[in-house]
Amino acid sequence: MMLNKKGLVAALALGGSMLLVAGCAGGGDTGGGDAGGGDTIKIGVLATSEGNLAFGMDEAKAAIAVALGARDGDVDGATIAGKTVEIIYAGTDGTTASAQTQAKKLVESDGVDIVFGPVSGDEGETIVQYALTVPEVTFVNGSASPVGMTLEGAENFFRFHGDSAMWMGGVGDYAVNDKGYKKVYLLAEDYSFPYDNAGGFFQEFCAAGGEINGASWVPVGTTDYATIIAQIPADTDAVYAGLGGADAASFLSQAVTNGVTKPLIGGTIAVDTTALSGDANIASAAVGMISGGPVPGAGFSNPVWDDFVAAYATQPNAFPSPSIFALLYYNSFESLLLSLEAAEGDLSDDQAALRDELSNLSWDSPTGKITMDANRQAIVDNYMNEVVQADDGSLVLETITTTNGVKQGTTVYDRFETCGDIE
């Protein structure tokens, strides 16, 4: 199922109205710790500290520490444009209720000027709806990637990375025309991010002549994949695994123990270091898995990327290489800091100067140039990758092709079972 823009507007408006009622009932001060005239700018950071993506807070802090460390600051703050920037962290469990509660606390109790985050897709949609109710606060996304967040989002909300459908661009054509996959079984988590991520792949795959020959949408946190593996049709050419974090690692492990011999196509976060670095025994399932996303392969190098990787490696609890979450949080937080500096820390007039800089930002990030479109959505470079085994036995990405200047489309996806559902 796909949603048109009219339906999306109605959904966001309804969600925003419901949150507005909840906000009014809760009382308390709304944001604006600086309100343009003080010497302190408060930034509230949302990141997952529990659940399937519990590592999100560590990755967020690593990214922020790298960005602020380059300005003689640390994970808790720095001096930016003559203002004291104070960071307040709020952990979530990846659910909408948790994200809403923590965002409201940051704005209405802690009095932050800017909300930065969250990590996951459903959280992101909730935060956009909340942003509609507090227009005096600026929101900069962390890594949440549903398509609709910026297509019809709040004017005070900015995203400095691609959406999850953009990330799979080119992979569907490659699967059919280069890999020869004609029938693919769909396995993915049942929430907004995988809908768009899988939709971006399968719309292209189906248009190229491919067929979805079965589908399983599973709850986040699923631990038993044996029954799903058993029902994969024998004539399947490949399995699409739209899973992330602990779920992806669990599936890959069970794919090995249950004798899955079909090639795999990974959703963007299924091939992330957070899934590939935990179990050395998953190589037989993971090697050869193709995917697309914002993280380049192991051979990628430029001075900005190399500096980022080196600084990331010094952070507590760092993965062998920067995860997608660390990269997106870094690119997004650095974008915020560059804009604060360009605005000279001015948050007056409903943060007009800051928002103008955010809307028009252009810079060379570790993974390529970032510019913004009229919807406050980034135009970015994208990487199609394949999982390979390095000489030391570790699983890493190897880039197949790079696409520069990828722009957002206008299709928002829901659950689908067949190619006919997304045509």
Question: Where do the protein language model's features map onto the residues?
Answer:
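Short, low-complexity disordered leader/linker segments with a strong preference
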Residues: M1-K42, T418-E423
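Beta-alpha junction/loop-to-helix N-cap segments that form part of ligand/metal-binding clefts
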Residues: N4, D29-A35, F55-A62, D74-L151, ...
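Extracytoplasmic "Venus flytrap"
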Residues: G37, I41-A67, R71, A90-A97, ...
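Short, solvent-exposed amphipathic alpha-helices that sit
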Residues: G56-V75, S98, W167-G170, S192-E211, ...
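Extracytoplasmic ligand/sensor domains, especially the bilobed periplasmic-binding protein
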Residues: V112-W217, P263-S291
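Extracellular/periplasmic periplasmic-binding protein-like sensory domains
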Residues: A255-Y330, A342-E344, E398, T403-I422
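Short, charged, surface-exposed loops that flank catalytic or proteolytic processing sites
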Residues: E341-D356
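Solvent-exposed, acidic/polar segments of extracytosolic/periplasmic ligand-binding ectodomains
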Residues: S359-E423
